[in-house]
Regions:
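A conserved structural/catalytic subdomain of Rossmann-like adenosyl-cofactor enzymes
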Residues: 1-192
């Protein structure tokens, strides 16, 4: 699979940031659990960014960015990951491709929390939490689909979008997808 390939071809001390669907974090079976275990033990899997829905053409896609570095095995045999920092950029945030697109400014808090080059100086915030390796390894099937923020939209039925708003969002997503596909079709038509 894609993730296994990346992990295999990375050079020692190489770094990666990989966008993957949610199921990689909790997929049952030996393959899914094995990938997560290898990621935690052989790599310094230091950061997980939970992406909001509405930023991809396919509506409802739940994805994450995994940030990790390949390390040589530790002399003490312990995992290379000491702690995983998770930034929840999904709960109570909503983006669309046209009316409310994701912008660079929306990621400023994550960038500030990430502390490029200064991982040891990170501080927890409401959206950014640290999970120790011992805690992660005890989780059933190494499930890394971790969340702590309460989704307010699930409690407040009155705050749910109206049917016409939902319909308008569907139309917007379909139009954006159609435009993207039309651009591909136009490009293919030009080539001999």
């Amino acid at each position: 699979n894609f993730m296994q390939h990346i992990m295999t071809v990375m050079s020692s001390h190489g770094r990666a940031g990989v966008v993957l669907p949610d199921n990689v974090l909790f997929e049952a079976g030996s393959a899914g659990e094995g990938i997560r275990r290898r990621l935690l033990e052989q790599f310094d899997f230091h950061t997980l960014l939970r992406l909001p829905t509405g930023i991809f053409y396919k509506p409802g896609v739940k994805a994450n960015v995994l940030f990790f570095e390949k390390r040589p095995p530790r002399a003490d045999g312990k995992p290379n990951t000491k702690a995983l920092w998770i930034y929840d950029f999904r709960t109570n945030l909503h983006f669309t491709l046209k009316k409310n697109p994701l912008d660079t400014k929306d990621l400023q808090d994550f960038v500030a929390c990430y502390q490029v080059g200064l991982l040891g100086q990170r501080r927890e915030t409401e959206r950014f939490k640290r999970f120790e390796i011992d805690e992660l390894l005890k989780r059933d099937k190494l499930n890394l689909d971790i969340f702590w923020l309460k989704d307010e939209s699930l409690d407040d039925v009155d705050s749910l979008p109206t049917p016409d708003f939902i319909a308008a969002e569907i139309v917007e997503n379909l139009q954006a997808a159609l435009e993207a596909f039309q651009a591909v079709a136009d490009e293919l038509a030009v080539k001999p």
